């Protein structure tokens, strides 16, 4: 019965792991719902300011903010939003694949790259992969604040204003639904004209107190809001991916336990049969 004892030990070990993954699944469900609420609360502001900025990009105001002016691309910047923890399936891996693909296109054109990394997984990836990381922040927690991001974002905005980078993009996972998280690379600056149907009209603006003061503040708020929205959406995507990963792990553990239980029963049956055969054989010999 040595084999049977070993199988029983494996079953007990897998059941213990199954309890952990089941608990982690339940925790991820709770955290995902809270993350979805934060995402839904911040999305209207992010979308509205993006719409206003789109109008400004299509308009021709008397003051053209540097964020609205295209220039030759010699160096680009990426704000990469990753998770702090693992056990979330291929969420980070798929994100890094999309980023590396976009970086490869730029490098083929001789464009250099600067990186601002949000999340421990992104920092670990670029330590191994290589890259010019100029700013990094991690451990934002379950309820990230825009104030925690301002310092890192400012590094990239200053680099753009000083001409050290010519384009800034944000790389993150979009929360489509519980089952789908889509890695995206979106250009933040210079602003791209919004292709909405309503923006085909000509827009004129009156600025108070003046265009420069208003746009200087609005453009910074725009970038900060888009990065913050990327962070909260990535957090919701992370919890959804972790929930699915833990559910799959729990289900797989159940299947493995069933298979091992069947093997155990067969081993036990074989041992009993062997014992009976030995008893019968001994009785016959007598």
From Swiss-Prot:
One GO cellular component, as annotated: plasma membrane
Intracellular or extracellular location(s): Cell inner membrane
Membrane topology: Peripheral membrane protein
Keywords of the record: ATP synthesis, Cell inner membrane, Cell membrane, CF(1), Hydrogen ion transport, Ion transport, Membrane, Transport
An example Gene Ontology biological process: proton motive force-driven plasma membrane ATP synthesis
InterPro entries according to UniProt: ATP_synth_F1_ATPase_gsu (IPR035968), ATP_synth_F1_gsu (IPR000131), ATP_synth_F1_gsu_CS (IPR023632)
GO MF entry, a single one: ATP binding
Assembly behavior: F-type ATPases have 2 components, CF(1) - the catalytic core - and CF(0) - the membrane proton channel. CF(1) has five subunits: alpha(3), beta(3), gamma(1), delta(1), epsilon(1). CF(0) has three main subunits: a, b and c.
PANTHER family named in the record: ATP SYNTHASE GAMMA CHAIN, ATP SYNTHASE SUBUNIT GAMMA, MITOCHONDRIAL
HAMAP family: ATP_synth_gamma_bact
Record function comment: Produces ATP from ADP in the presence of a proton gradient across the membrane. The gamma chain is believed to be important in regulating ATPase activity and the flow of protons through the CF(0) complex.
Sequence similarity: Belongs to the ATPase gamma chain family.
Protein name per the record: ATP synthase gamma chain
């Amino acid at each position: 019965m040595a084999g049977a004892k070993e199988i029983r030990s494996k079953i007990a070990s897998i059941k213990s792991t199954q309890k952990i993954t089941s608990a982690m699944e339940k925790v991820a469900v709770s955290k995902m719902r809270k993350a979805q609420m934060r995402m839904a609360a911040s999305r209207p502001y992010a979308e509205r300011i993006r719409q206003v900025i789109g109008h400004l990009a299509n308009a021709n105001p008397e003051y053209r903010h540097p964020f609205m002016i295209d220039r030759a691309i010699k160096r680009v910047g990426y704000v990469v939003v990753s998770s702090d923890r693992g056990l979330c399936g291929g969420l980070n891996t798929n994100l890094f694949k999309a980023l590396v693909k976009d970086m490869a296109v730029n490098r083929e054109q001789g464009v250099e790259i600067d990186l601002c990394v949000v999340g421990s997984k992104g920092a670990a990836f670029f330590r191994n992969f290589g890259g010019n990381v100029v700013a990094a922040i991690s451990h934002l927690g379950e309820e990230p604040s825009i104030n925690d991001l301002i310092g890192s974002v400012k590094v990239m905005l200053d680099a753009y204003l000083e001409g050290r980078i010519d384009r800034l993009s944000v790389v993150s996972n979009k929360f489509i639904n519980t089952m789908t998280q889509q890695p995206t690379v979106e250009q933040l600056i210079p602003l791209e004209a919004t292709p909405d149907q309503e923006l085909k009209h000509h827009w004129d603006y009156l600025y108070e107190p003046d265009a420069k003061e208003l746009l200087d503040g609005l453009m910074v708020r725009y970038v900060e809001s888009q990065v913050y929205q990327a962070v909260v959406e990535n957090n919701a995507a992370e919890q959804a991916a972790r929930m699915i990963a833990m559910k799959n792990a729990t289900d797989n553990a159940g299947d493995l336990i069933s298979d091992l239980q069947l093997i155990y029963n067969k081993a036990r049956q074989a041992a009993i049969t062997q014992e009976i055969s030995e008893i019968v054989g001994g009785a016959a010999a007598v």
